[in-house]
Amino acid sequence: MAIDNRLLPNTLAAQAAALPSAWSQALAAPGVAQALDHIINHVEARLAAGATVYPATPLRALSSLAPSEVRVVILGQDPYHGPGQAQGLAFSVPDDCKCPPSLRNIFKEIGRDYALDGKPGHDLTPWVKQGVLLLNTALTVEDGQPASHAKRGWETVTDALFTQVAQDPTPKVFLLWGAHAQAKAALLPPGHAHLVLSANHPSPLSATRAPTPFIGCGHFRLTNEWLEKQGQTLIDWTATFKKIPAQAEFRL
């Protein structure tokens, strides 16, 4: 049975108010607070009109990480627009949800460099716990209507969040997949020390397309090689896979 991931009426403003104070710099930037108020009002109006909006926790990507704790940024575009899918983390869905095609290609690319043993878990929370920010540029969507809340104010908010992370003095990795994400490179400060890796979006429509195919890009390995040079702990990209005990392990 699919998890009920519908956003409840009159909850988005409270979720925004409960964000860690470390994000307040971005949310207090000129025009950002107004944009956030605008999108909250739009979402509440759509809910009052009977629309189904996903996910239940649009700001989840920010609730577990402060900007200084972010080590890797992966940008998505729009939450999944089907029931039981979106959970507030870019590309991530609950473990019992069918694996979306883009996430399947992400796992395929990881598997080129790392052994994927066990049952794949589609919930990418284990990455978040290691400092990976999984941020969509629009944070809500209506059922069956992709990009329905794009251009409603979310981009102003998420651009400010991206900028705050990019201005943090600790170097980070930015994985920019597809033209939409790559356009955000313009928000990086001049002379930054970050590692920026670009490739096509992992969608089946573009994952193997030249000149910068996603499949074969090596971004997960390159990220860890760079983190190692920085003296940082590597990301366990296989952490979402659930170990299946061998038959012998059940013996007494």
From Swiss-Prot:
Documented EC number(s): 3.2.2.27
GO biological process: base-excision repair, AP site formation via deaminated base removal
Enzyme active site: 78 (proton acceptor)
Keywords recorded for this protein, A-Z: Cytoplasm, DNA damage, DNA repair, Hydrolase
Compartment(s) where it occurs, according to its Swiss-Prot or TrEMBL record: Cytoplasm
Catalysed reactions listed for this entry: Hydrolyzes single-stranded DNA or mismatched double-stranded DNA and polynucleotides, releasing free uracil
Main location per the UniProt record: cytoplasm
Keyword DNA repair appears in the UniProt entry: yes
KW DNA repair (keyword) present: yes
InterPro entries: UDG_fam1, Ura-DNA_Glyclase_AS, Uracil-DNA_glycosylase-like, Uracil-DNA_glycosylase-like_sf
GO cellular component: cytoplasm
SMART domains: UDG, UreE_C
Classification via Pfam families: UDG
GO MF term set: uracil DNA N-glycosylase activity
Role according to the record: Excises uracil residues from the DNA which can arise as a result of misincorporation of dUMP residues by DNA polymerase or due to deamination of cytosine.
Similarity comment text for this entry: Belongs to the uracil-DNA glycosylase (UDG) superfamily. UNG family.
The protein's name: Uracil-DNA glycosylase
Origin species: Bordetella avium (strain 197N)
Lineage: Bacteria, Pseudomonadati, Pseudomonadota, Betaproteobacteria, Burkholderiales
